[in-house]
Amino acid sequence: MNRLQDDYDPYAVEEPSDEEPALSSSEDELDVLLHGTPDQKRKLIRECLTGESESSSEDEFEKEMEAELNSTMKTMEDQLSSLGTGSSSGVAKVGGVTEKFYDEIYFDSDSEDEDKTVTKKKKKKQHRIPTNDELLYDPEKDNRDQAWVDAKRRGYHAFGLQRPRQKQQPVPNSDAVLNCPACMTTLCLDCQRHESYKTQYRAMFVMNCSINREEVLRYKNPENRRKRRSAKKMRSNPEDPAEREAEEIYHPVMCTECSTEVAVYDKDEVFHFFNVLASHS
C-alpha cells in the first residue's frame, strides 16, 4: 500500500512532445492547401514566404494611416495659427484662396467698463466673411442690377453722356416696368400709363421686342366713322384717299423669347403695350 502511494504523484502532468505540434501544424497547412478558401491559402503563402502573419501587415497599415493623419492635422494647425497671427487688414490666404474677415468694430462691445486686462490676454477671434457660394446668394447682385437699370433709363433720356465732373441727374420717373405675360421677360423699363385705360402703356424705348412690319393693323377713329356714315347717305362711291389717311396704321409687336403679341407700333415710332405684366419701377 505504501508502495502505491509512493509511485503516485498527483502533480505529475504528461506534456506533449515537441514533435506533436509540428505534425499538427503541418497537417493543418496541408489541409488548408487542399481544402481551404482562397483567403486562407493567400495568408498561408504569405506566412511561408515572408514569415509575417496577416496581423503584422495590418498593424503596419494602421501605423501608416496614423502617421498620415498626424501630418494632416499638423498642416491644418499651422494654417489656423497663421490665420490667428495674420495682419488686421481682414484678408487672409489659405490654400490659394483669399478669405475676407469682418472689421473688429462690428463685434466690439459698447460697454466701457469691461476689464481691459482680460481683453488684452484674450486673443481676439476674427470673424470670416462667408463667400457667396456658402450664402447661396449674392448680397450685392440687387444693387448691381438696380445700377444697370438706372444707367439704361438715363441713357434713354440722354443723361448717359455726361461729363465726369457734372452732377449726376436723378433717374426719370416711370409708371411701371413691363414684362411679358407668358415668359416674364422684361420688355420696357421706362413707360407712361394711359390716362383712361389703366392696363395700357406707351413707350419709345423697349427691349426684347420684335415688330412684324409685314402685318398691318388699321384703326378708324370714331369721328371718322360718324362722318362716313353721314356721307354714305349722300353718295355711294367708295372711300377716297383722304379717308384712308385718317385711319391709324399699326404693326403688331411680339416678344422675342416666346412670340407672344404684347403691343402695337404706330407710325410715330411709339409702342402701345396692352398685353403685359406691370410691376413697380
Curated annotation (Swiss-Prot):
Residues 225-235 have a biased composition (Basic residues). The keyword DNA damage does not apply. Its main location: cytoplasm. GO terms for biological process: negative regulation of transcription elongation by RNA polymerase II; positive regulation of cell population proliferation; positive regulation of transcription elongation by RNA polymerase II. The modification Phosphoserine is found at S17, S109, S111. Residues 236-245 have a biased composition (Basic and acidic residues). Residues 15-27 have a biased composition (Acidic residues). Residues 1-27, 222-245 are annotated as: Disordered. Disulfide bonds: none annotated. It comes from the Eukaryota. Keywords: Acetylation, Cytoplasm, Nucleus, Phosphoprotein. GO terms for cellular component: cytoplasm; nuclear speck; nucleus. Pfam families: Eapp_C. The modification Phosphothreonine is found at T37. InterPro entries: E2F-assoc_phosphoprotein. The keyword Acetylation applies. The modification N-acetylmethionine is found at M1. It is found in: Cytoplasm; Nucleus. May play an important role in the fine-tuning of both major E2F1 activities, the regulation of the cell-cycle and the induction of apoptosis. Promotes S-phase entry, and inhibits p14(ARP) expression. Interacts with E2F1. The C-terminal half binds the N-terminal of E2F1. Also interacts with E2F2 and E2F3, but not E2F4. This is E2F-associated phosphoprotein. It comes from Mus musculus (Mouse).
